[in-house]
Each structure stands twice: as structure tokens, then as C-alpha cells.
Regions:
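Intrinsically disordered, low-complexity terminal regions enriched in Ser/Thr/Pro/Gly
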Residues: 22-270
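Bacterial N-terminal signal peptides
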Residues: 7-16
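Positively charged n-region of N-terminal signal peptides that target proteins for export
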Residues: 1-4
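Sec/Tat signal peptide C-region and signal peptidase I cleavage site
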Residues: 17-21
Length: 270
């Protein structure tokens, strides 16, 4: 049977801070997010062609004489009946260069054209090979069918999408992002999807006189049937200090239905 689920480790990033003494191994601050460093994604939901990132902080790690930690992370997704949809274990070994006993871990759940619809459970266990302690958590994840939706939103420092970024940036930096659109109408054997980008200030006032607009059109009937998602890339410049909102609106011009997504952007001095 073809799996609808591809489980992949995107990375384990060492982001440590000082701690007075080793404590009990714990997992803290579990978040769904838009990319490894992007803003929090409030709902633990999966859509076709989505890419759900989950990040968390592991604390209370034991290190060896050189300051190195040695852990393994087990990730499992099961459906409502307990059937395993995907399972993966990876090792994470690294030097805690800022000291302390903690680091940030992130994993992602990239989906194919089908998702396990309904209630699922994500299970993650972290094992410290040096202290022989383990910590784990579970989160419910809801699989949903593909209505018109923005999915797999991620942010980057570069246009090529190789350097993941936060939406907390320094003055003068560009902020690149990419996303997929699903659930558009194909009944007329054509696709016409529009992406509009606008930014808002702290009071909710629109900054751009007109939104930045990108269009995707496909009129070849065979290509239309084989197109599962529309891929967009765009960027904004962080030209002034403050707190802002990035508003991304997608419109299916075949039906004039729209959906939008808003994320916070903070610009600080270098």
C-alpha cells in the first residue's frame, strides 16, 4: 500500500543557554510552526501537500567531559485506531557551544496528496544516552481534506530557500517565503489562482497602497488534472523598525473564493 505519509528529520539545532546544574530530562515549549524558525502555527492540522513542523526544547541533558550531548529522538504518528502511519528514529549528537544542558529540536511531517483524515496522535520520545533518561509527549493532529487552503508556508533568508528564517528579522534584511495552495477548482479544465501580499502596521493599517499580486494560470486540460498544488514564492523587505503583520491572501479566480493567513513580523535594529 502506498504510504500517504513521509516522515523526515529536517534538523536538530543546538541553541543552548546556561543552567546551574543538570536537572531531570524534560521537553518544553512544544509548538507547531511555519518552518523550523517561523512563527507559531496555532492548529496541529495536516492537509494534502502540507508540511507541518513541530519544534520543542529539550532540557536537563547530561554532557560528557567535552560538553557534548548524545541523544536519540523517536517520532511516531498513529491514527485513531492506533495504526502506525509513520515512524522514524534519529540520533542527535552535538557540542553545546553556549554551555548549559538544553537545545532545540524540530521535526517535520511532509504530506503527499492524501492525508489520514480525522484524529491522529503524534508521539515523540527523546532519550539521553549519557544519563539513560527519557522524556516524551503526545499531541493530537487532525487530518483534513483539501479545501482552498494555504499550506506548507516557510520562511527563508535567501531566495533559493536554503536558509530557514524567523519572521523576527533585522532592519534591512529581506524576508523570503514560499507556500503551496490546494483545493482550487478544476471543473472548467483550467486553473487561475491569485496570491496577494500585504503588510499591516501595529494598528492594523495597510502599509502598501496596493498589495503585491502574483498569478498562476494553467489552461492545458491534462496539466490541470495532474496539478495537485500551486507553488508560490515571494518576499518583503524589512525597511523599518517595529511590529507588523504579513497578510497572505489566495483567491481562486475560477470561483472567486478566497482564504487568507496572517503571521507576525518583528523588525529590530542590527
Amino acid at each position: 500500500m502506498k504510504s500517504v505519509f513521509i516522515l523526515a528529520l529536517v534538523g536538530c539545532i543546538i541553541l543552548s543557554w546556561s543552567a546551574p546544574a543538570q536537572g531531570k530530562l524534560q521537553i518544553e515549549n512544544v509548538q507547531a510552526c511555519y518552518g523550523p524558525f517561523g512563527p507559531e502555527r496555532k492548529a496541529f492540522e495536516l492537509y494534502p501537500f502540507d508540511n507541518l513542523f513541530i519544534r520543542f526544547t529539550v532540557t536537563g541533558l547530561k554532557t560528557d567531559a567535552t560538553g557534548k550531548a548524545d541523544t536519540s529522538v523517536k517520532v511516531k504518528l498513529v491514527d485513531a485506531k492506533g495504526k502506525v502511519i509513520g515512524e522514524y528514529t534519529f540520533s542527535s549528537t552535538g557540542l553545546l557551544t553556549l554551555g548549559g544542558q538544553s537545545f532545540l529540536v524540530f521535526v517535520n511531517l511532509p504530506m503527499r496528496d492524501q492525508v489520514p483524515v480525522g484524529k491522529n496522535t503524534l508521539m515523540i520520545t527523546v532519550s539521553d544516552k549519557l544519563s539513560e533518561e527519557s522524556a516524551s509527549f503526545e499531541r493530537p493532529i487532525t487530518g483534513k481534506k483539501g479545501k482552498l487552503q494555504i499550506v506548507a508556508l516557510e520562511f527563508f533568508h535567501d531566495a533559493d530557500g536554503k536558509l530557514p528564517a524567523s519572521t523576527n528579522g533585522a532592519l534591512g534584511e529581506p524576508l523570503h517565503f514560499r507556500l503551496r495552495v490546494i483545493g482550487f477548482d478544476r471543473s472548467k479544465e483550467k486553473i487561475h489562482t491569485e496570491l496577494a501580499v500585504q503588510t499591516l502596521d501595529a494598528e492594523g493599517k495597510e502599509n502598501l497602497p496596493k498589495p503585491l499580486v502574483l498569478n498562476f494560470q494553467e489552461k492545458d486540460a491534462r496539466a490541470v488534472q495532474n496539478t495537485g498544488f500551486v507553488f508560490f514564492t515571494s518576499s518583503i523587505g524589512l525597511n523599518r523598525l517595529g511590529k507588523f503583520t504579513l497578510r497572505i491572501t489566495v483567491t481562486d479566480r475560477s470561483t472567486n473564493q478566497s482564504t487568507k493567513l496572517e503571521v507576525p513580523v518583528t523588525v529590530t535594529a542590527p
